Amino acid sequence: MALRKELLKSIWYAFTALDVEKSGKVSKSQLKVLSHNLYTVLNIPHDPVALEEHFRDDDDGPVSSQGYMPYLNKYILDKVEEGAFVKEHFDELCWTLTAKKNYRADGIGSSPLSNQDAFRLWCLFNFLSEDKYPLIMVPDEVEYLLKKLLGSLSLEMGLGELEELLAQDAQSAQTAVGLSVWQFLELFNSGRCLRGVGRDSLSMAIQEVYQELIQDVLKQGYLWKRGHLRRNWAERWFQLQPSSLCYFGSEECKEKRGTIPLDAHCCVEVLPDREGKRCMFCVKTASRTYEMSASDTRQRQEWTAAIQTAIRLQAEGKTSLHKDLKQKRREQREQRERRRAAKEEELLRLQQLQEEKERKLQELELLQEAQRQAERLLQEEEERRRSQHKELQQALEGQLREAEQARASMQAEMELKKEEAARQRQRIAELEEMQERLQEALQLEVKARRDEEAVRLAQTRLLEEEEEKLKQLMHLKEEQERYIERAQQEKQELQQEMALQSRSLQHAQQQLEEVRQNRQRADEDVEAAQRKLRQASTNVKHWNVQMNRLMHPIEPGDKRPTTSSSFTGFQPPPLARRDSSLKRLTRWGSQGNRTLSVNSSEQKSLNGGDETPILALASQEEKLDPAPGN
């Protein structure tokens, strides 16, 4: 079922690419070509008559996606066998069809993405997209993929930058809930998400994430492996997948040297160092034990953890780590959505309670108003009784009997009024008690609001602290960039100085070559100048002392004047007019020998006793100019 969903996502892009008019329908001829290509890449026996028979009643018109879907399920997807085809070739077919109509890369080559990188990002998008059409990738998965790519580049992106980046692309109702694949590719081509990252670095990062998520490569790298027959150690490129650990002759993975099958009964153990190998561990299978050695302890820990993860997946019956992680992330998003809905429902319930509370407060106000009216009526009644009593007292003198009767009737009426007053006081007491309970509920509500405000203030304070820390990190990053620029400037100055010294050395070597030629010409006259050797040796010693003071090994950064002046400034002394030809010849030969000895000592001082000065200088340049990879 999972494989069918993955295949349907790619086929959906191919089908929509053929739908030029955006009407949801594709002509039958185009569907024939698409079906034939799907048969080929999926290694399914081709049935050319099935499509005609399936749509026999619709020979003239186009075929919609609903009409093509039953044929696709019955004749293609139901016959697909996992492992019988190369899924990458299938994805390349669908990408080729959809990229021609929808993807427009920069034609002049300035786009950060090559066609291969765009294809791999398209596959990653299909893997992480939701199982709903049209296919979109939610912001959580976009953030997950960007963090994967940045992790491969050893970079980091703040949550604020990512939210700002996604907010810039929220231009339609669709982007409010996610990104389409073309918006996703445009995000990379625009260079907004990975500023300052080279095209080659980005391509390597995309390839690494593609191998990890799509090809289920848990880990890969060089390890030393011990052989089973000759028991010698050889360095191999290992590639770990959930079901096997393969090793190759090089990282191009062209020459496969072997495969270590992994199952639930395998185990990995750390071994002590021996035989000159350190950071050793072994993988034990049912039939054999494989010994390996990592470059350091950290690499060994990563490899053992990755192999244990693969064994755990085999024990749990799972075929892909990232499919399991994707399902867990999807379940977490659903849980967050349910919690959000529950929170909204709780807020709605609290709002209803608040409305009920306001309604009861209004009823309480009405009861208080009724109480005030009852008190006012009671006072009016009391005043009326007093006036009647006074009238009765005035009439009592003249009509005693009538007064007695009136008094009796008045007493009965007073009893009734007292009972009514008692009932009114009891009602007032009940209303006062209800008012106290409502006031207590109001105080609890006020306290809850104050607690909520305190929590909100604490959250605001934490956000301000996080912004301050982010500013500090950005300041540190700027200082590091300034330090790198200063180091590069110093490096350029050292390189210029080394180039100047190299030119001086070449000039000195040319002069040495001229001296050697003079020596060859002077060797013919050496036999005639033997009588002057002692005097010439004295002069040679004098010249050697002075030249040794001037000529020292050229060190990096040494700003001494070039030594070529000591050779160009040397001129033979003029001959006296009355010197004989023999004296001139002898004197010229002694000067040639002295120049030869001076230049030989100069060459030794330049070379520092070594006959390869240029190699020594080159090694100094290599020390000053480290390789870009370091």
Curated annotation (Swiss-Prot):
<feature type="region of interest" description="Disordered">
    <location>
        <begin position="378"/>
        <end position="418"/>
    </location>
</feature>
<dbReference type="InterPro" id="IPR011992">
    <property type="entry name" value="EF-hand-dom_pair"/>
</dbReference>
<keyword id="KW-0007">Acetylation</keyword>
<dbReference type="Pfam" id="PF00169">
    <property type="entry name" value="PH"/>
</dbReference>
<keyword id="KW-0963">Cytoplasm</keyword>
<dbReference type="InterPro" id="IPR001849">
    <property type="entry name" value="PH_domain"/>
</dbReference>
<dbReference type="InterPro" id="IPR011993">
    <property type="entry name" value="PH-like_dom_sf"/>
</dbReference>
<comment type="subunit">
    <text>Interacts with IRF4, activated RAC1 and F-actin. Both the phosphorylated and non-phosphorylated forms bind phosphatidylinositol 3,4,5-trisphosphate (PtdInsP3). Interacts with ZAP70. Interacts with RAB11A.</text>
</comment>
<feature type="modified residue" description="Phosphotyrosine">
    <location>
        <position position="210"/>
    </location>
</feature>
<feature type="compositionally biased region" description="Basic and acidic residues">
    <location>
        <begin position="378"/>
        <end position="392"/>
    </location>
</feature>
<dbReference type="GO" id="GO:0005856">
    <property type="term" value="C:cytoskeleton"/>
</dbReference>
<feature type="modified residue" description="N6-acetyllysine">
    <location>
        <position position="225"/>
    </location>
</feature>
<feature type="modified residue" description="Phosphoserine">
    <location>
        <position position="590"/>
    </location>
</feature>
<keyword id="KW-1003">Cell membrane</keyword>
<comment type="function">
    <text>Phosphatidylinositol 3,4,5-trisphosphate-dependent guanine nucleotide exchange factor (GEF) which plays a role in the activation of Rho GTPases RAC1, RhoA and CDC42. Can regulate cell morphology in cooperation with activated RAC1. Involved in immune homeostasis by ensuring proper trafficking and availability of T-cell regulator CTLA-4 at T-cell surface. Plays a role in Th2 (T helper cells) development and/or activation, perhaps by interfering with ZAP70 signaling. Required for optimal T-cell effector function, lymphocyte homeostasis and the prevention of systemic autoimmunity.</text>
</comment>
<dbReference type="GO" id="GO:0005634">
    <property type="term" value="C:nucleus"/>
</dbReference>
<protein>
    <recommendedName>
        <fullName>Differentially expressed in FDCP 6</fullName>
    </recommendedName>
</protein>
<keyword id="KW-0966">Cell projection</keyword>
<feature type="region of interest" description="Disordered">
    <location>
        <begin position="552"/>
        <end position="630"/>
    </location>
</feature>
<feature type="compositionally biased region" description="Basic and acidic residues">
    <location>
        <begin position="331"/>
        <end position="341"/>
    </location>
</feature>
<feature type="compositionally biased region" description="Basic and acidic residues">
    <location>
        <begin position="620"/>
        <end position="630"/>
    </location>
</feature>
<keyword id="KW-0472">Membrane</keyword>
<keyword id="KW-0206">Cytoskeleton</keyword>
<dbReference type="GO" id="GO:0098876">
    <property type="term" value="P:vesicle-mediated transport to the plasma membrane"/>
</dbReference>
<dbReference type="GO" id="GO:0005911">
    <property type="term" value="C:cell-cell junction"/>
</dbReference>
<dbReference type="GO" id="GO:0030175">
    <property type="term" value="C:filopodium"/>
</dbReference>
<keyword id="KW-0597">Phosphoprotein</keyword>
<feature type="region of interest" description="Disordered">
    <location>
        <begin position="318"/>
        <end position="341"/>
    </location>
</feature>
<feature type="compositionally biased region" description="Polar residues">
    <location>
        <begin position="588"/>
        <end position="606"/>
    </location>
</feature>
<dbReference type="GO" id="GO:0048471">
    <property type="term" value="C:perinuclear region of cytoplasm"/>
</dbReference>
<keyword id="KW-0539">Nucleus</keyword>
<dbReference type="GO" id="GO:0005886">
    <property type="term" value="C:plasma membrane"/>
</dbReference>
<feature type="domain" description="PH">
    <location>
        <begin position="216"/>
        <end position="312"/>
    </location>
</feature>
